[in-house]
Amino acid sequence: MSLDLALDIQHATTCDWLPTDEQFALWVTNAIGNSMNEAELTIRIVDSRESQMLNSTYRGKDKPTNVLSFPFEAPPEIELPLLGDLVICAAVVENEAREQQKTLEAHWAHMVVHGCLHLLGYDHIEDEEAEEMESLETQLIEGLGFTDPYKEQ
């Protein structure tokens, strides 16, 4: 199945290294390609301040986070390919990659795949859900040529 993807990438911060639009598109397509034929999605790259504000507002956690997912839910009678928005904090991704001894590219890919799975309805609150989501993430990330993101370095 081929995915018709409309991807809007918004850069609200700068950092040493960011994925290209093509990399983002590849990772999104890999994560959601078998779930739908058509998808619209926004990825917004933000600084720590914006991430912290959004995380505090929507999750009640007053600190920046790596990725926030905002699924779009249309009324049942309206069919739209709008999947939702991902907000990714570049500084948090950089820090986590360094702490976890991963390449920036591998960790960015993981955050995009992780966020897309949330947009598709996956979650990791309950242990069983977390196992299912992490297993799928690992499969998708390894399919992109990266190592298991949950394997200890």
From Swiss-Prot:
Single strand-specific metallo-endoribonuclease involved in late-stage 70S ribosome quality control and in maturation of the 3' terminus of the 16S rRNA. This is Endoribonuclease YbeY. InterPro entries: MetalPrtase_cat_dom_sf_prd, YbeY, YbeY_CS. Its cofactor is Zn(2+). Its EC number is 3.1.-.-. It is found in: Cytoplasm. One of its GO terms (molecular function) is RNA endonuclease activity. Zn(2+) binds at H114, H118, H124. Belongs to the endoribonuclease YbeY family. Binds 1 zinc ion.
